[in-house]
C-alpha cells in the first residue's frame, strides 16, 4: 500500500483560451491545479482522471502520479475573453470516471485526504464509499455545473 497526502478525483481538462485573435492551449481543471499547488508545497498528490492519447500529459505532470481511465476524447473547454468577460463552452464533455475501471489501482493507495473535484459531474457516486480512513473534501462547482 502506498500512502499519499492527497488524492484528487476529477478530470484534467484541455483549455483553449481565446484572447483577441490568438488561441492559447493549456491544461486545466481543479485536479490539475491541485497537483501544481501540492507540488510547490511539497505534498504528494495523486490524480484520478480520464485521459486520451491526444495530450502528452508527461510534459505537465509526473505520470506516476496519474491514475487514469482511458478515453477517446478528453474534456475540452473553450474560454473566449472579450472586453474583460469570459464566455465559456464545453467542446468535449467528460465520460463518467468509474470505480470498476480503476479498482486495482485504488486498492493500492491510502490517501490522507481525498479531494473530490469534478469538472462536469463525472465522478461515479461509488467513489464516496471508498477511503474510509481519509479526510474528504469537495469542490462543489463541478457537481452543480
What are these model-predicted stretches?
Residues 10-12, 30:
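Active-site metal-binding loops of divalent metal-dependent hydrolases
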Residues 29-40:
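Histidine-anchored nucleotide/phosphate-binding helix
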Residues 30-31, 71-72, 140-143:
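Short, acidic/turn-prone active-site loops that include or flank metal/cofactor-
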Residues 9, 139:
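Conserved N-terminal Rossmann-fold NAD(P)-binding element of oxidoreductases
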Residues 121-122, 143-145:
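Short, catalytically relevant binding-site loops at active-site mouths
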Residues 3, 14-25, 40-117, 121-122, ...:
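Conserved N-terminal subdomain of the carbohydrate kinase-like
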Amino acid at each position: 500500500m502506498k500512502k499519499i497526502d492527497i488524492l484528487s478525483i476529477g478530470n484534467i481538462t484541455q483549455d483553449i483560451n481565446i484572447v483577441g485573435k490568438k488561441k492559447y492551449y493549456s491544461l486545466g481543471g481543479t485536479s490539475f491545479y491541485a497537483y501544481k499547488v501540492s507540488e510547490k508545497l511539497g505534498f504528494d498528490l495523486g490524480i484520478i482522471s480520464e485521459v486520451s492519447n491526444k495530450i502528452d500529459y508527461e510534459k505537465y505532470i509526473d505520470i506516476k502520479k496519474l491514475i487514469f481511465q482511458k478515453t477517446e476524447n478528453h474534456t475540452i473547454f473553450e474560454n473566449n475573453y472579450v472586453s474583460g468577460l469570459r464566455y465559456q463552452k464545453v467542446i468535449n464533455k467528460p465520460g463518467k470516471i468509474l470505480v470498476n475501471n480503476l479498482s486495482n489501482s485504488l486498492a493500492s493507495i491510502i490517501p490522507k485526504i481525498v479531494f473530490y473535484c469534478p469538472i462536469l459531474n463525472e465522478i461515479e457516486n461509488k467513489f464516496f464509499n471508498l477511503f474510509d480512513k481519509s479526510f474528504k473534501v469537495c469542490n462543489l462547482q463541478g457537481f452543480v455545473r
